[in-house]
């Protein structure tokens, strides 16, 4: 969108879609980060990473930046935070994680969250 507004409408986008905020035609896009784009609000993301006590990396190759660098940022700026990789297989960032749990996210994530909620995790 030309106006940079975010609209929460659930509509099918076409080349003729009109922005409800500025009226621009054909400039709408989904509110996601495409491959090769930089996410908005990186300062806020880094600040949140520096405050975290538990960092989970779920279902990622760990190779696409800037997200691939988040675990290193946590290790450097939030050294007391626990880092956990939940993935199908090890990534290139594997040495940066305190714990590794491999398997389908549909299985390992609920099991890990259950452990956390039951107090059966190390910090």
Segments predicted by a language model, with ranges:
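Conserved catalytic alpha/beta core of Sir2/sirtuin-type deacylases, generalized to analogous enzyme cores
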Residues: 1-123
């Amino acid at each position: 969108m030309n106006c940079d507004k975010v609209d929460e409408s659930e509509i099918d986008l076409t080349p003729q879609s009109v922005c409800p905020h500025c009226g621009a035609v054909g400039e709408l896009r989904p509110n996601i980060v495409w491959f090769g784009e930089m996410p908005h609000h990186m300062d806020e993301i880094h600040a949140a990473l520096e405050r975290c006590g538990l960092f989970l990396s779920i279902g990622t190759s760990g190779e696409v930046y800037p997200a691939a660098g988040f675990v290193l940022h946590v290790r450097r700026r939030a050294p007391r935070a626990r880092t956990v990789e939940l993935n199908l297989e090890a990534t290139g960032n594997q040495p940066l994680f305190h714990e590794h749990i491999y398997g389908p996210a549909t299985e390992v994530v609920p099991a890990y969250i259950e452990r956390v909620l039951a107090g059966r995790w190390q910090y």
